[in-house]
From Swiss-Prot:
Entries under InterPro entries matching the protein: Calcineurin-like_Pesterase (IPR024201), Calcineurin-like_PHP_ApaH (IPR004843), Metallo-depent_PP-like (IPR029052), UPF0046_metallophosphoest (IPR051693)
Keyword set, alphabetical order: Cobalt, Hydrolase, Manganese, Metal-binding, Nucleotide-binding
Tissue spec. comment: Expressed predominantly in fetal brain.
SUPFAM superfamilies: Metallo-dependent phosphatases
Binding site for GMP: N117, H118, K225, E226, G252, I253, H254, E255
Assigned protein family: Belongs to the UPF0046 family.
Summary of subunit composition and partner proteins: Homodimer.
Regulation of its activity: Inhibited by nmolar levels of AMP and GMP.
Top EC class, one word: hydrolase
Binding-site residues, Mn(2+) 2: D86, N117, H213
Annotated function: Displays low metallophosphoesterase activity (in vitro). May play a role in the development of the nervous system.
Cofactor: Mn(2+); Co(2+)
Name this polypeptide is given: Metallophosphoesterase MPPED2
Amino acid sequence: MAHGIPSQGKVTITVDEYSSNPTQAFTHYNINQSRFQPPHVHMVDPIPYDTPKPAGHTRFVCISDTHSRTDGIQMPYGDILLHTGDFTELGLPSEVKKFNDWLGNLPYEYKIVIAGNHELTFDKEFMADLVKQDYYRFPSVSKLKPEDFDNVQSLLTNSIYLQDSEVTVKGFRIYGAPWTPWFNGWGFNLPRGQSLLDKWNLIPEGIDILMTHGPPLGFRDWVPKELQRVGCVELLNTVQRRVRPKLHVFGGIHEGYGIMTDGYTTYINASTCTVSFQPTNPPIIFDLPNPQGS
């Protein structure tokens, strides 16, 4: 496939033959297509906070997976905050309110948020199934009354919440989606393959910034303890072959914190918490030139 230039024409993504085994998919495409190799694919150093913002640019501040541990985070200067989910432990209304209060004290012009697999109450189908179950895997969530969580996203009064939806701010089209491959039955989990692809097919072309909770295959998705890649193949194909955003921000995999590029799209795993849930990974800033006419 071509690297470094946008794709042309209508592209239809289908379920990849290696969809169910991302580690095998990575190996196959790396050997047969050099899909994850330099010079087009490489690591990117983060921008130091004291770097002046270039004229005619917007500065994005990227964070993720804060898990109700925001008190000690040093937030840098920027224009727009992007938080790609897991801002709570379980999505309890009290946790959401605390997060919203924290957002309210931040100076950014816009704060854009998506849910992650830990925001259980934001996933209506998950909550409906949980109520039917005769067990208490998440006792504090199971005890909630429907009126406590039916419109829990409305508690996020200090941000723009995206869920399979987009917003345009300062001329940038930004789309957010919370879905991740199934992992131990948390919120917004779907089976790999067609179920996830159906969600990615909702992403419109022409998006400048894509926010998902989890990574695409091959970009900041390595889990050393398991010696496995866990990114979504269909998400990778959607990003590289159809949508081609300038920036793809995600989290989910705490071990994958950092920045990469494929020569066209920049990929940021902004997980604030480490694998031991210590909020020590600093926010990542990224500058993009303002769209013409904005």
